[in-house]
């Protein structure tokens, strides 16, 4: 596991227990933006998060990060508590299951019917298989995608 992945896992271990319902920890990213190191913690709740929510969560999360010993951060960083946005990543099976009926974008490790990217409505997620309806030019088609082939999935905005 590389240093960044280790930091993300350490942060997840201490942050997950302090984020309580109705909030949900969606993702954690740590990396350089410009010359600054940024620790981004993506949090959501059913009706969406507000600026006050992010301020409250910062007050809860920041002190917890200071308890990690030894300090895993090699340099000073900025803490960012934020919403995952409209195109929220679907990084777990539970997240995919919660997206049934929604419009999603799926990237694959290996092509199905000569396609490695599908965008459409997730009709079902059962027994480790996604069933999606998508448009192929002017025709609606359905595709079965084994979860093991999914490299990346996120909610998508239908234009």
Curated annotation (Swiss-Prot):
One of its GO terms (cellular component) is cytosol. Gene3D superfamilies: Ribosome maturation factor RimP, C-terminal domain (2.30.30.180), RimP-like superfamily, N-terminal (3.30.300.70). It is found in: Cytoplasm. Pfam families: DUF150_C, RimP_N. InterPro entries: Ribosome_maturation_RimP (IPR003728), RimP_C (IPR028998), RimP_C_sf (IPR036847), RimP_N (IPR028989), RimP_N_sf (IPR035956). The keyword Repressor does not apply. One of its GO terms (biological process) is translation. It comes from the Bacteria. Keywords: Cytoplasm, Ribosome biogenesis. The keyword Cell membrane does not apply. Required for maturation of 30S ribosomal subunits. PANTHER family: RIBOSOME MATURATION FACTOR RIMP (PTHR33867:SF1). Belongs to the RimP family. HAMAP family: RimP (MF_01077). This is Ribosome maturation factor RimP. It comes from Streptococcus pneumoniae serotype 4 (strain ATCC BAA-334 / TIGR4). The gene is rimP.
């Amino acid at each position: 596991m590389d240093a960044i992945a280790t930091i993300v896992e350490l942060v997840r271990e201490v942050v997950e227990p302090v984020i309580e319902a109705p909030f949900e920890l969606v993702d954690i990213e740590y990396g350089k933006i410009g010359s600054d190191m940024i620790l981004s913690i993506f949090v959501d709740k059913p009706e969406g998060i507000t600026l006050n929510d992010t301020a409250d969560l910062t007050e809860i999360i920041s002190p917890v990060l200071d308890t990690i010993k030894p300090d895993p951060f090699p340099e000073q960083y900025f803490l960012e508590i934020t919403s995952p946005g409209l195109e929220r990543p679907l990084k777990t099976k539970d997240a995919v299951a919660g997206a049934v009926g929604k419009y999603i974008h799926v990237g694959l490790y290996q092509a199905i019917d000569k396609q490695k990217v599908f965008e459409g409505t997730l009709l079902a997620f059962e027994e480790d298989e996604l069933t999606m309806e998508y448009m192929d030019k002017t025709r609606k088609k359905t595709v079965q995608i084994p979860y093991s082939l999914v490299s990346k999935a996120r909610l998508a905005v239908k234009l």
